[in-house]
Amino acid sequence: MKNDVISPEFDENGRPLRRIRSFVRRQGRLTKGQEHALENYWPVMGVEFSEDMLDFPALFGREAPVTLEIGFGMGASLVAMAKDRPEQDFLGIEVHSPGVGACLSSAHEEGLSNLRVMCHDAVEVLHKMIPDNSLRMVQLFFPDPWHKARHNKRRIVQVPFAELVKSKLQLGGIFHMATDWEPYAEHMLEVMSSIDGYKNLSESNDYVPRPASRPVTKFEQRGHRLGHGVWDLMFERVK
């Protein structure tokens, strides 16, 4: 499952342009279970888009570190992380409603109270709803690599986007990316290394081993069986 959730084009003031998206809305058919989850669990765990900044302590009912995941696919790894780290809070963004329904269903099954989800364009959410200096971590796992050269501008990891993420991270917060497409990994590394205020957490100044905190997805397991590599990058906001 590829996640592909945001439109990375910005104007000169850093505001998102709406002309080019890095995702295509492929809503697909909802299963009965996904439809049931959207109808019954969205009122509890769903967050509607608005132009008001989120108050995380009010949203989750407590003070706790917040992780934002952009493009959670069907939500399996996001639910696993929220289950494994009950002391932290998680907000996931995904534009495809079947994935949102699947995530809500799994989260309900696990009885999670530390997970909220949104179904909206992530750049708009970052600009309009995420307070500056509020996130402990931002996760972007397996975004669409847009293989063809003429589509490279659609890749979400571009300098303006990485700068936007940095502004939302707390000092010491982490931007964690993963991809199975080596040219995209190289692109991510080039973009992130060019930005003042980020520190690469790799000892070799490139990629990090997969941290135990990131579950291995079915998509990734299949890739390993086929001999595909996976590259993790972790950058800390240091100023």
UniProtKB/Swiss-Prot annotation:
Pfam families xrefs: Methyltransf_4
Entry function: Catalyzes the formation of N(7)-methylguanine at position 46 (m7G46) in tRNA.
Pathway(s) of this molecule: tRNA modification; N(7)-methylguanine-tRNA biosynthesis
UniProt keyword annotations, A-Z: Methyltransferase, S-adenosyl-L-methionine, Transferase, tRNA processing
Similarity comment: family membership: Belongs to the class I-like SAM-binding methyltransferase superfamily. TrmB family.
InterPro entries: SAM-dependent_MTases_sf (IPR029063), tRNA_(Gua-N-7)_MeTrfase_Trmb (IPR003358), tRNA_methyltr_TrmB_bact (IPR055361)
Region (Interaction with RNA): 150-155
GO MF, one annotated term: tRNA (guanine(46)-N7)-methyltransferase activity
The protein's enzyme class: transferase
HAMAP family reported in the protein's UniProt record: tRNA_methyltr_TrmB
Reactions this protein catalyses: guanosine(46) in tRNA + S-adenosyl-L-methionine = N(7)-methylguanosine(46) in tRNA + S-adenosyl-L-homocysteine
Ligand binding (substrate): K148, D180, T217, K218, F219, E220
Lineage summary: Bacteria, Pseudomonadati, Pseudomonadota, Gammaproteobacteria, Enterobacterales
Gene3D superfamilies in UniProt: Vaccinia Virus protein VP39 (3.40.50.150)
Residues at the active site: D144
Name of this chain's protein: tRNA (guanine-N(7)-)-methyltransferase
Oligomeric form and interacting partners: Monomer.
EC number(s) reported in the record: 2.1.1.33
Binding site for S-adenosyl-L-methionine: E69, E94, D121, D144
GO cellular component: tRNA methyltransferase complex
